């Protein structure tokens, strides 16, 4: 068992923010994890990653021994595991980056893409909803950030009505549509949409 997996079995520390970053061993996710681990030493960062073709813990060698970094090997589609982690670590923030990527792979294996990008996002939302709803303060101070891709809507002009180009974008946009479900119970609707040049 690695040091990080041992550390992840400890209970949550009081007085800190406890944040899950999904897909934290991926290219973009590892940069987000590194930023949070180094910038917010009072936050406990839980890198939840399945370690598929896109995930590589070597991306995080420089932070793996930091006391506020914890690796959790798990699948975002495993609702029970995600929900248990949220309860055990008293999670109050989620940065959701985990997703199947690469358009070519979506053509070869559309079911895996749909399972991860659609049902995985729904699993994360539902775990957050149920856990945060059970707390006395409910959703106060809680945050769920879903990071997506510019491929959701394909090659559209910014003024074009939303549309999708299958198959990759269909699965990615389905995950985004589940966020409409999330706005029914989260108190704030914070949106940030990066654009490719």
Where are these regions (language model features)?
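N-terminal Rossmann-like NAD(P)+-binding domain of SDR-like oxidoreductases, especially those catalyzing
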Residues: 2-197
């Amino acid at each position: 068992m690695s040091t990080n997996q041992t550390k992840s079995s400890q209970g949550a520390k009081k007085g800190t923010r406890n944040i899950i970053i999904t897909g934290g061993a991926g290219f973009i996710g590892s940069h987000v994890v590194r930023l949070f681990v180094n910038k917010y030493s009072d936050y406990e960062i839980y890198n939840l990653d399945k370690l598929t073709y896109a995930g590589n813990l070597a991306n995080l060698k420089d932070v793996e021994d930091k006391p506020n970094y914890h690796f959790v090997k798990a699948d975002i589609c495993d609702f029970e595991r995600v929900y248990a982690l949220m309860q055990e670590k008293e999670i109050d923030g989620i940065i959701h980056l985990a997703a199947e990527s690469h358009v070519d792979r979506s053509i070869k294996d559309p079911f895996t893409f749909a399972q991860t990008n659609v049902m995985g996002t729904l699993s994360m939302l539902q775990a957050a909803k149920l856990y945060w709803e059970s707390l006395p303060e409910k959703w106060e101070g809680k945050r769920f950030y879903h990071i997506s891709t510019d491929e959701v809507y394909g090659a559209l002009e910014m003024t074009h009505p939303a549309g999708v180009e299958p198959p990759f974008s269909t699965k990615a946009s389905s995950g985004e549509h589940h966020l409409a479900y999330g706005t029914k119970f989260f108190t704030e609707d914070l949106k940030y949409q990066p654009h490719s040049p």
